[in-house]
Design a protein with these regions (language model features):
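A contiguous loop/helix-start segment that scaffolds small-molecule binding in enzyme catalytic cores
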Residues: 2-17, 21, 29, 104, ...
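Generic beta-sheet signal
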Residues: 31-35, 102-109, 157, 182-186, ...
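General beta-strand structural signal in soluble alpha/beta enzymes
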Residues: 61, 134-139, 186, 212
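Conserved helicase motor
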Residues: 82-90, 163-166
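Class I SAM-dependent methyltransferase SAM-binding "motif I" and its flanking Rossmann-like core
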Residues: 122-180
């Protein structure tokens, strides 16, 4: 299709000038740039992330070898320094000193969004505590990619990161999450996956809809959807899977449906009843905690008043 034509005052036609670019490369100012990188497919990087990685003075990386390979794919190199759980206490003061001096530092994890199950949050928190500039450069996330592919409810979800490696502590953590009326999202390692699924069946029950997603956006991506019991049985007899794993578990049976029903009934009741009265009535009718119902009622009332 050709470019649109516009009539000139003399009746002749001419081609419109292209509109000014709305994605012009901005000059990189000082500060800490929390920069997301791909979780697998190298093209899943943003233009802004490339601008930051090319324009910064230093990249603080969870593993400098991994980040160096990533930069080589895009055809450039930058000074790298390791920043991880092992050296964070030692490196943080040095990086903060550079930020105070006006340096432009990009913080990256090995894959995905930094600060999500990642050691970088202490550096970001320390920089913010000193009123140093901190910028988010959003992008890929295994947690959200897994949720997108899971077919589980996405209106309410809770990211719980890695569960404890020891069985007793892991089961205690799962007990605390048992009644959460939302999709639960975890990261897990291949060697621990079978034991984690077995503990989930024991604590959460085997009927919950669940998903094991691994190697997301990579060549050997696998998304396995089944009940917790079926997944536990499969991985109990299988070799430990390789690659990064995102584990998703549906909320407790009935709870999500109860909350959806609660919101519908609140929308009907609040135009005619005070918030407290509507909350008390529906908490009794649906056998839900009064505090939870009152919180929903306040939120629905605010939405109606907007």
């Amino acid at each position: 299709m050709g470019k649109p034509m516009t009539a000139s005052p003399q009746g002749k036609s001419f081609r419109q000038s292209p509109p000014p670019s709305r994605v012009e490369k901005a000059e990189l100012g000082p500060g800490l740039y929390l920069t997301a990188t791909p979780i697998g497919h190298a093209r899943d990087i943003t233009l802004r992330a490339l601008d930051v990685l090319q324009g910064c003075d230093l990249i603080a990386a969870e593993d400098t070898r991994v980040t160096a390979k990533l930069l080589a794919i895009y055809g450039f190199a930058k000074p790298l320094t390791p920043y991880n759980d092992h050296n964070g206490e030692r490196e943080r003061p040095r990086l903060l000193a550079k930020l105070r001096a006006g340096a432009r530092i990009a913080l990256v994890s090995d894959a995905g969004t930094p600060l999500v199950s990642d050691p970088g949050f202490k550096l970001a928190r320390a920089a913010l505590a000193e009123d140093l500039p901190v910028h988010a450069v959003p992008g890929a996330s295994a947690m959200l990619t897994g949720l997108m592919l899971s077919a589980l409810p996405s209106d309410r979800f809770l990211f719980a990161g890695f569960l404890p490696p020891k069985g007793g502590e892991r089961r205690t953590a799962l007990e605390a999450l048992k009644a959460v009326p939302a999709t639960l999202i975890f990261y897990e390692t291949g060697p621990r996956l079978a034991a984690t699924l077995a503990d989930m069946v024991a604590v959460l029950g085997g009927a919950r809809a669940s998903v094991v997603a691994r190697e997301l956006t990579k060549l050997h991506e696998e998304v396995r959807r089944a009940s917790l019991a079926e997944l536990a049985a499969h991985y109990a007899d299988a070799e430990p899977p390789k690659g990064e794993i995102t584990l998703l578990v549906g909320g407790p049976a009935g709870k999500t449906a109860d909350l959806e029903q609660l919101d519908r009934l609140l929308d009907q009741a609040l135009p005619f009843m005070p918030v407290r009265a509507a909350a008390d009535l529906l908490a009794d009718a649906l056998s839900l905690p009064r505090k939870l119902v009152y919180g929903h009622a306040l939120a629905r009332k605010d939405r109606q008043d907007d």
